[in-house]
């Protein structure tokens, strides 16, 4: 929105030309995202406490989690509002990719909100029935997938980029729709599974978003895209503003979510944030890099799949508890140690993912 205003004012006041620079808007997106979250946070927390919207703790979980019962949840609302407002302020709203990401934010945020509402307010421990949750996730993801496939104007928008191999970029064709669906829904649920400790999900989300901010900038810059042998996608650079909004809003949320947490993000936050990372990876054609940089999310998801599969097939559990962060808690690791070590792993994986852009 401010881009339009600045373009109108620039002929009269040249100072406003700075708003047209992507890097300036990306930095401002971080700052406003952070500012919105810090402003919304205390007000939202007080409101959640007033309405007695508190976390329900599993009886079979680690004993250290019993003290978390009643902590305000659905704090993801502050993250999504902060991202949305920052994007509306600083992104070029004429860019279709901006609206695709905002659609994902709103649709998956709504699914998560309904799930939290049923759990916390309606006192239904199962929340939104699993099949209906996956149905609406699938519906939203498929709408996006079909839209992107139908509106693709260049081959670069539907190729599969394979890390380490600069000459292997097969055209996906209709498989693009299927892959987009799995990436969005998979990422959404992976972040949701990771959100089990104070700050555990949000900081890896911030780090991965930072990595994709750089990738989006390079993908939308024809010179850097050619230099790195990655597809040039004309509209992709604007995604940098969205990624930096995630960084700012995420850090603002972490201010209240750090151990011991004053608020939890709930499904309204985790489902939406995962889906946003998924759609950004699709738009910049770096789905495999999401798999690498979001390795902690993958590890958490695989631990659940392996645990359930092993129990059904052999009647035995592999881990003391899944997702795997609970396994380490039950081994005696203090919660902050689990959190920080998972953060360190994510930092290493994000750097590794960025390095793969050059090692081709």
From Swiss-Prot:
<comment type="pathway">
    <text>Cell wall biogenesis; peptidoglycan biosynthesis.</text>
</comment>
<dbReference type="GO" id="GO:0005886">
    <property type="term" value="C:plasma membrane"/>
</dbReference>
<feature type="transmembrane region" description="Helical">
    <location>
        <begin position="338"/>
        <end position="358"/>
    </location>
</feature>
<keyword id="KW-0479">Metal-binding</keyword>
<feature type="transmembrane region" description="Helical">
    <location>
        <begin position="168"/>
        <end position="188"/>
    </location>
</feature>
<feature type="transmembrane region" description="Helical">
    <location>
        <begin position="94"/>
        <end position="114"/>
    </location>
</feature>
<keyword id="KW-0133">Cell shape</keyword>
<keyword id="KW-0961">Cell wall biogenesis/degradation</keyword>
<keyword id="KW-0131">Cell cycle</keyword>
<keyword id="KW-0812">Transmembrane</keyword>
<dbReference type="GO" id="GO:0051992">
    <property type="term" value="F:UDP-N-acetylmuramoyl-L-alanyl-D-glutamyl-meso-2,6-diaminopimelyl-D-alanyl-D-alanine:undecaprenyl-phosphate transferase activity"/>
</dbReference>
<feature type="transmembrane region" description="Helical">
    <location>
        <begin position="288"/>
        <end position="308"/>
    </location>
</feature>
<dbReference type="InterPro" id="IPR000715">
    <property type="entry name" value="Glycosyl_transferase_4"/>
</dbReference>
<dbReference type="GO" id="GO:0008963">
    <property type="term" value="F:phospho-N-acetylmuramoyl-pentapeptide-transferase activity"/>
</dbReference>
<feature type="transmembrane region" description="Helical">
    <location>
        <begin position="21"/>
        <end position="41"/>
    </location>
</feature>
<feature type="transmembrane region" description="Helical">
    <location>
        <begin position="236"/>
        <end position="256"/>
    </location>
</feature>
<comment type="similarity">
    <text>Belongs to the glycosyltransferase 4 family. MraY subfamily.</text>
</comment>
<keyword id="KW-0472">Membrane</keyword>
<dbReference type="InterPro" id="IPR018480">
    <property type="entry name" value="PNAcMuramoyl-5peptid_Trfase_CS"/>
</dbReference>
<keyword id="KW-0997">Cell inner membrane</keyword>
<keyword id="KW-1133">Transmembrane helix</keyword>
<dbReference type="GO" id="GO:0071555">
    <property type="term" value="P:cell wall organization"/>
</dbReference>
<dbReference type="Pfam" id="PF10555">
    <property type="entry name" value="MraY_sig1"/>
</dbReference>
<dbReference type="GO" id="GO:0051301">
    <property type="term" value="P:cell division"/>
</dbReference>
<dbReference type="GO" id="GO:0008360">
    <property type="term" value="P:regulation of cell shape"/>
</dbReference>
<dbReference type="Pfam" id="PF00953">
    <property type="entry name" value="Glycos_transf_4"/>
</dbReference>
<protein>
    <recommendedName>
        <fullName>Phospho-N-acetylmuramoyl-pentapeptide-transferase</fullName>
        <ecNumber>2.7.8.13</ecNumber>
    </recommendedName>
</protein>
<keyword id="KW-0132">Cell division</keyword>
<keyword id="KW-0460">Magnesium</keyword>
<feature type="transmembrane region" description="Helical">
    <location>
        <begin position="199"/>
        <end position="219"/>
    </location>
</feature>
<feature type="transmembrane region" description="Helical">
    <location>
        <begin position="263"/>
        <end position="283"/>
    </location>
</feature>
<dbReference type="GO" id="GO:0009252">
    <property type="term" value="P:peptidoglycan biosynthetic process"/>
</dbReference>
<feature type="transmembrane region" description="Helical">
    <location>
        <begin position="142"/>
        <end position="162"/>
    </location>
</feature>
<keyword id="KW-1003">Cell membrane</keyword>
<dbReference type="GO" id="GO:0046872">
    <property type="term" value="F:metal ion binding"/>
</dbReference>
<dbReference type="InterPro" id="IPR003524">
    <property type="entry name" value="PNAcMuramoyl-5peptid_Trfase"/>
</dbReference>
<keyword id="KW-0808">Transferase</keyword>
<feature type="transmembrane region" description="Helical">
    <location>
        <begin position="71"/>
        <end position="91"/>
    </location>
</feature>
<keyword id="KW-0573">Peptidoglycan synthesis</keyword>
<comment type="function">
    <text>Catalyzes the initial step of the lipid cycle reactions in the biosynthesis of the cell wall peptidoglycan: transfers peptidoglycan precursor phospho-MurNAc-pentapeptide from UDP-MurNAc-pentapeptide onto the lipid carrier undecaprenyl phosphate, yielding undecaprenyl-pyrophosphoryl-MurNAc-pentapeptide, known as lipid I.</text>
</comment>
């Amino acid at each position: 929105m401010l881009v339009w205003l600045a373009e109108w004012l620039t002929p009269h006041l040249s100072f406003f030309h700075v708003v047209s620079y992507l890097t300036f808007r990306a930095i401002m997106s971080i700052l406003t995202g952070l500012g919105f979250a810090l402003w919304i946070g205390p007000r939202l927390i007080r409101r959640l406490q007033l309405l007695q919207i508190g976390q329900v703790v599993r009886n079979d979980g680690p004993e250290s989690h019993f003290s978390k019962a009643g902590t305000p949840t659905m704090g993801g609302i502050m993250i999504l509002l902060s991202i949305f407002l920052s994007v509306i302020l600083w992104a070029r709203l004429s860019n279709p990719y901006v609206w695709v990401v905002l659609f994902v934010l709103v649709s998956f945020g709504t699914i998560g909100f309904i799930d939290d509402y049923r759990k916390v307010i309606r006192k239904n421990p199962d929340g939104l029935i699993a099949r209906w949750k996956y149905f609406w996730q699938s519906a939203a993801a498929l709408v996006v997938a079909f839209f992107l496939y139908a509106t693709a104007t260049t081959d670069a928008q539907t190729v599969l980029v394979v890390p380490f191999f600069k000459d292997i970029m097969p055209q996906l064709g209709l498989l693009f729709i299927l892959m987009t669906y799995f990436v969005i829904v998979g990422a959404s649920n992976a972040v949701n599974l990771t959100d089990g400790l104070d700050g555990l999900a949000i900081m890896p989300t911030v780090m991965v978003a930072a990595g994709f901010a750089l990738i989006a900038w390079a993908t939308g810059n024809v010179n850097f895209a050619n230099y790195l042998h990655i597809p040039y996608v004309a509209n992709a650079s604007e995604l940098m503003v969205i990624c930096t909004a995630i960084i700012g809003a995420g850090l603002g949320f972490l201010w209240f979510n750090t151990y011991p947490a004053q608020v939890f993000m709930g499904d309204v936050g985790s489902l939406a944030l995962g889906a946003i990372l998924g759609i950004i990876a699709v738009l910049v054609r770096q789905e495999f890099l999401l798999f690498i940089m979001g390795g902690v999310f993958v590890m958490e998801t695989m631990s659940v799949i392996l645990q359930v599969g092993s129990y059904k097939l052999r009647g035995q559990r592999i881990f003391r508890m899944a997702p795997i962060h609970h396994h380490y808690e039950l081994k005696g690791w203090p919660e902050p140690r689990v959190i920080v070590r998972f953060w360190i792993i994510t930092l290493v994986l994000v750097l590794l993912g960025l390095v793969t852009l050059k090692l081709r």
